[in-house]
Amino acid sequence: MNVDWPRFREVINAANNIVLTSHIRPDCDALGSCLGMAGILEALGKQVRIVCGQPVPENLKFIDPENRILCIDEDIEAKDFEDADLHIILDTSAWIQLGPMADVIRNSTYKKIIFDHHVGEDNIDAELFKNTTAEAVGRMCVDAAECLGVQLTPAISIPLFAAIATDTGWFRFNSVKEITYETAAKLLAGGAIPADIYRDLYERETAGRVRLRGTVLARIQTELD
């Protein structure tokens, strides 16, 4: 399925107050795509909020330094965005993956669209914008920026590079193709620094890791004594 980009542009141009949502148990493609899309839409003067069904996992908090991704019922309530006129669901086409946001979306009256690369879907009552050949929704977001005439900035490029890199196993999976590298190059030109993103993803010491290492070392010392 190919995205109808002229129709996508029409939908975006008609909206002013937009909510972005992705799936529970979020990964970098989900979170990075939400943040990248938020930057794209805000460049057009749109008001944007990101509201998901679960908090950002500890190991992925680096991707959202401004804490823009809100958790429903913890950081924000449904009544706080009743004034939205568009809800974009990214990186999923299934109710079950939306967690507590599913009922919020079901009960809402604003327009809903799905922006996704997965083949499977259920009966979410939303207009579909899907590219099932895309290796990541992050790549679709770059296409969206081009469709909407938005220049890639670091705030857009960094999360979208993380989205694509992680959903392709850091460019090792068979889903990687020529356009993947072309898109990655655009994101580098926009300000993404792969070495920094890789370090934040895989080499940063979390508090949990430090505590675990301390526990292991303490046990070793006890046994030696």
Language model features with spans:
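Amphipathic coiled-coil/heptad-repeat helices and related helical stalk/stem segments
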Residues: 1-8, 73, 97-98
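A structured phosphate/pyrophosphate-recognition subdomain
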Residues: 2-24, 36-42, 122-225
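Short phosphate-binding/catalytic loops that engage adenosine nucleotides
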Residues: 46, 110, 192
